[in-house]
Amino acid sequence: MIVVTGAAGFIGSNLVRGLNRRGIQDIIAVDDLTEGDKFLNLVDCQIADYLDKDEFRRRVLAGSLPPLRAVLHQGACSDTTERNGRYMLDNNYRVTLELFEYCQAHAIPFLYASSAAVYGGSSVYVEDPTNERPLNVYGYSKLLFDQVLRTRMKSLTAQVVGLRYFNVYGPHEQHKGRMASVAFHNMNQFLAEGHVRLFAGWDGYADGGQSRDFISVEDVVAVNLHFLDNPGTSGIFNCGTGRAQPFNDVAAAVVNTLREERGEAALPLDKLVEQGLVRYIPFPDDLKGRYQSYTQADVTQLRAAGFAAPMRDVQTGVAEYVRYWRARKA
């Protein structure tokens, strides 16, 4: 049996599908369906059982779970604007620590979601404490458990892998609202208004030039399954493509894929801007000083751990996402 927490969420539900594609259905899905629409992410998934996150936590603390092959811990509050530190640390740090201790006590492999938010204001994205400067309590809540793992690395009884997700996009993120990817928002904007919006330049960046390491959720699933297949490997690893691309690339990929659907030719960025299909809005004052304008994962350690598969660039991955999303809407 494999536990997937956050199973009705974005990455969690895609992980369940990835396991299903391997013929694995002995899955305990753990989530909080207070926002009931998230169940839609599990409709086409095969699982053995569902547990509410609070009931699951009680069973963890009571030591009453069935024998497990692995725990894939994706459940967390991922809202980077959440200011309630007490809630964030309990939900993201304390629960992760409890699961870690349970898995160590029972020699169960434990893969968990960390985040590139731990780097915050750093300009170097290498898995080293000198580069970790979170800008918000979300990033700190993720860093705190990474620090615990580092102190325990030499005494582990079973595999523990922390994956620092960079900017993930792809199917089944619709419930995330404002925290959904820019690709998701650009798709909705273009279909509703005929154009997309990006932040104008700030902090030395041109309009739409702020750059992130955008990674398809399909590649995130592949990384998780790689470590599931290699239980002898533990550590903290960046989960990105190793390639920074500007938000302009995302917008252009969205608009051109939707244009092609209509039988219209793809256009270069300057023409998209000239025709008003890509527009820029002033950079929000409340984000100044709290915004990562550039991220690019150093994937040296990930590659050294044996993950050799190529990863999608924005042009490929976003186009796949748009086509998938439009097919589901048809």
Curated annotation (Swiss-Prot):
Class of the enzyme per the UniProt entry, highest EC level: isomerase
Cross-referenced CDD domains: ADP_GME_SDR_e
One record GO biological process: carbohydrate metabolic process
Free-text comment on the cofactor: Binds 1 NADP(+) per subunit.
NADP keyword on record: yes
Description of how the protein assembles with itself and partners: Homopentamer.
Function: Catalyzes the interconversion between ADP-D-glycero-beta-D-manno-heptose and ADP-L-glycero-beta-D-manno-heptose via an epimerization at carbon 6 of the heptose.
Protein name from the UniProt record: ADP-L-glycero-D-manno-heptose-6-epimerase
Native source species: Bordetella petrii (strain ATCC BAA-461 / DSM 12804 / CCUG 43448)
